[in-house]
Regions:
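A conserved regulatory-domain signal marking ACT and ACT-like small-molecule sensing domains
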Residues: 1-148
Length: 148
């Protein structure tokens, strides 16, 4: 199931990330996964949150620079298990002509296993191929249930 991602541009200086996280915390929005890409003068923060629409609204109201071009990005979240190692998942996607644009892991653990967030060039096809290969993909509701 596709999972919505929130992306925010931040000035690259101490405390910028803390400001974003504090704003989400004050509004009781949980963060399930987070990554930061250094872009020189600024950073790009990508997050999976408990309520992406609310997180977007709260951050926009606080004048954070949300990545407009990445506003409605959805990602795949796969469960890494004994049978579904990262190597198997990336091989399945690559053999089917799918490119992984970026990946990051989730802070949510599922009975000792972790989730991997994947941005691929064709999400619908990736989800279908992963299902056909019996790879467990997670929805936002699945993540919420395991985080509680």
């Amino acid at each position: 199931m596709p999972v919505p991602q929130v992306s925010v541009f931040l000035d690259n200086h101490p405390g910028s990330l803390a400001d974003v996280i504090e704003k989400l915390d004050k509004n009781e929005i949980k963060i399930y996964a987070l990554t930061i890409a250094d872009k020189g003068e600024f950073g790009l923060v990508r997050m999976i949150t408990e309520d992406p629409a609310k997180a977007t609204r709260v951050l926009e109201e606080a004048d954070f620079n949300l990545a407009k071009a990445r506003r409605n990005i959805e990602v795949a979240v796969v469960l890494i298990t004994d049978k579904d190692h990262i190597s198997r998942i990336t091989k399945i996607l690559g053999q089917n002509g799918l490119n992984i644009d970026y990946a990051y892991s989730s802070a949510v653990h599922f009975e000792g296993k972790f989730a991997l967030v994947l941005r691929v060039n064709d999400l619908e096809q990736a989800e279908r191929i992963l299902r056909e290969n019996n790879v467990d993909t997670l929805s936002l509701d699945d993540i919420k249930r395991h985080f509680a």
